[in-house]
């Protein structure tokens, strides 16, 4: 099968590799589509994701959809030809966190596309049957790649305990930020501010449901939010951009006893926070770690509200043009929202 390996920062190599038949309890899936995530771009450009350095060669990609081609011994409920989205995390199910339902912080988690665990920029993969989510014929597999990032957006709303009629500021209009805006709108947020420097993505934010959209290079975001809320601030700030300035804007824009939700992944290992307003306002600073079995809810959201969410997928490229795909996605060319490798 064809595999795209990252062998150095900004350098892919296409290889041919064999794949064993699926083991007991596993399903083999032919990968038809994989979205490029922001963390893939970090690994590609920077040689690391946060404090986790790349280990070359490595296979990125963790937003997959495809078709079942074979099943291992003991697998029931799946047959060749079934259309599926795939959860990319492998949990142990026996640590204290798994036993308490916090699978996303499993002590023994293995995440496909992390160093040492090949991801989905390849033609076939074996996975536990429990990692499959059935996709109906009515949903394009390219659109089904949104299940994984949409699950993260849904999980972030749970972590932030977002309530109907609350005010929310979303910093960053990449795919996760845009999906967060869509989820907030569908959850009944009273007013949503979105901040994004790329014009095409600001327009997408409006279509996803943002009430107010700003260019951070032209607008003092905190002043704008404070003026609109009578100097109160928002109930929750969500930092999907993960930059020093966006994190501190999120802190300054939050109301007293408000929440700051950090969904994005900072490139820097250490980021200076403005600690005084955090203490003075007694803010709750909340971190988001991927998702926690929200994939089925994400799929249902796509089926129910596809007209709003599906247009996020704007570009596709074949696997043998993966370098071109990463160049476009990383430079925000041509109005790119979500780039999908097919």
Q: Predicted regions span which residues?
A:
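Residues in the short beta-alpha loop(s) of Rossmann-like NAD(P)-binding domains
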Residues: 198, 266, 291
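C-terminal hydrophobic helical "lid"/dimerization subdomain
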Residues: 1-3, 248-252, 292-342
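Glycine-rich beta-strand-centered segment in the early N-terminal region that forms part
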Residues: 20-34, 49-96, 136-138
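Glycine-rich cofactor phosphate-binding loops and adjacent beta1-alpha1 units
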Residues: 160, 203-284
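NAD(P)H dinucleotide-binding glycine-rich loop of Rossmann-like/cofactor-binding domains
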Residues: 92-171
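Rossmann-fold dehydrogenase core element
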Residues: 259-261, 273-312
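Mid-domain Rossmann-like dinucleotide-binding core that forms the NAD(H)/NADP(H) cofactor-binding site
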Residues: 139-218, 223
